[in-house]
Swiss-Prot record:
Function of the molecule: Catalyzes the specific phosphorylation of 1,6-anhydro-N-acetylmuramic acid (anhMurNAc) with the simultaneous cleavage of the 1,6-anhydro ring, generating MurNAc-6-P. Is required for the utilization of anhMurNAc either imported from the medium or derived from its own cell wall murein, and thus plays a role in cell wall recycling.
Enzyme Commission code(s) on record: 2.7.1.170
Keyword Chaperone belongs to the record: no
Stored InterPro entries: Anhydro_N_Ac-Mur_kinase, ATPase_NBD
MF GO annotations: ATP binding; kinase activity; phosphotransferase activity, alcohol group as acceptor
Protein name (record): Anhydro-N-acetylmuramic acid kinase
Organism (species): Methylorubrum extorquens (strain CM4 / NCIMB 13688) (Methylobacterium extorquens)
Record's catalysed reaction(s): 1,6-anhydro-N-acetyl-beta-muramate + ATP + H2O = N-acetyl-D-muramate 6-phosphate + ADP + H(+)
Disulphide bonds in the chain: none
Top-level taxonomic group: Bacteria
Length: 377
């Protein structure tokens, strides 16, 4: 199959903003260049559109309004307003990206549009990512693939994580072999484990940055714990940590996809700012470590992406608990900030080719299935 250009979009549950990334792929192979020192050159240009505080507030309110949803098409409260905003903001992000990189709509074969998750309840057969793919395609003049989780959930899968098939393809293109762990730490944390035979197991491990960010916002007004500096000054409350790690969703075996809102920062409410930050950080790290009970082989190397890769306190904890080499994705030429956006570009290309997005070992679906709704401009 011929290589195509795809743009991926990701707006995560941390509500920071919209990541934009361009890759070239045929839905299986990824165009990747290794430099003389063995690092991977960037897959393609990237961009970002941050959310203003009022925009974050709208998305937070829409997420609360979604708690009572029973049908995917219902839009009570501010959900309809938020859905219009999501499509508009993503269009603005791509338009700015194209202009900055001297690209035209006809240079792009497809856009992979994740949308904004407001509720994810696979046991109820319910997952909702706000964002009108048809409206986005019409405004941009580019084919759009959206709603990539729904088919997996309809077929009995967990609907998440979706990025493992991209992780595996990227690792293979970069020459990495198992046993390898690829960890993405956004609002939640999810792991892709590749054993020495190339077999893949993937699942959400537990909280990521979500509870830490919520804690910092509530207690300090800051959006996150920059570099893990606040946590570095604190002392872990071991009793609270053990209580948090007893959460039934942490103990549950894969397949496992989680909802960011299932892990609250408020259990740390009686602690100092520093002690709360470090205890919630330890919760994320220990949940990853305990997930290895489900692995056929312990990874000898971990590659960490997402916002959590910038939290030095968290990275030190992971290195100690995992007893393995732990690398920031940026250190090997990958992009810790844009891995998910790149993944949704890749998934959009797979969707166009009818290739599987999910597998029994990633979401628990009975057989590999494709997904996504294709909207023509």
């Amino acid at each position: 199959m011929a290589m195509k250009r795809a743009i991926g979009l990701m707006s995560g549950t941390s509500l920071d903003g919209i990541d934009v990334a361009l890759i070239e792929s045929d839905g299986e192979r990824i165009r990747l260049v290794k430099s003389a020192n063995g690092l991977v050159a960037p897959l393609g240009p990237t961009g970002y559109r941050g959310y203003a505080e009022a925009e974050r507030a709208l998305l937070r309110e829409a997420t609360r309004d979604a708690e009572g949803l029973r049908a995917r098409t219902d839009r009570p409260g501010r959900l309809a307003e938020a859905e219009d905003f999501v499509a508009r903001a993503h269009a603005e992000a791509i338009e700015a990206f194209l202009a900055q990189n001297d690209l035209r709509p006809e240079d792009i074969d497809v856009v992979g549009f994740h949308g904004q998750t407001v509720i994810h309840r696979p046991k109820l057969g319910l997952t909702v990512q706000l964002g009108d793919g048809a409206a986005l395609a019409k405004r941009l003049g580019i084919r759009v693939v959206s709603d990539m989780r729904a088919n997996d959930v309809a077929q009995g899968g967990q609907g998440a994580p979706l990025v493992p098939v991209f992780h595996k393809a990227l690792a293979e293109a970069a020459g990495f072999t198992g046993p390898l762990g690829i960890l993405n730490i956004g609002g939640l944390a999810n792991a892709t484990l590749i054993d020495s035979g190339g077999n893949m197991l993937a699942f959400d491990t537990g909280p990521g940055n979500g509870p830490i960010n919520d804690w910092m916002k509530e207690r300090t007004g800051q959006d996150f714990d920059e570099g893990g500096a606040t946590a570095a000054r604190g002392t872990v409350d071991e009793d609270l940590l053990e209580n948090l790690l007893g959460h039934p969703l942490i103990l549950r075996a894969p397949p496992k996809s989680l909802d960011r809102n299932w892990f609250s920062h408020r259990l740390a409410g009686y602690l100092t700012v520093e002690d709360g930050a470090v205890t919630l950080t330890a919760f994320t790290a220990h949940a990853v470590a305990r997930s290895l009970a489900f692995a056929s082989e312990r990874p000898a190397r971990w590659i960490v992406g997402g916002g959590g890769a910038k939290n030095r306190t968290l990275m030190v904890m992971l290195e100690r608990l995992l007893a393995a080499e732990v690398l920031n994705a940026d250190a090997i030429g990958w992009s810790s900030d844009f891995l998910e956006a790149q993944a949704f570009a890749y998934l959009a290309l797979r969707s166009l080719e009818g290739l599987p997005l999910t597998y029994p070992t990633t979401t628990g679906v009975a057989a590999p299935v494709t997904g996504g709704i294709v909207s023509e401009p």
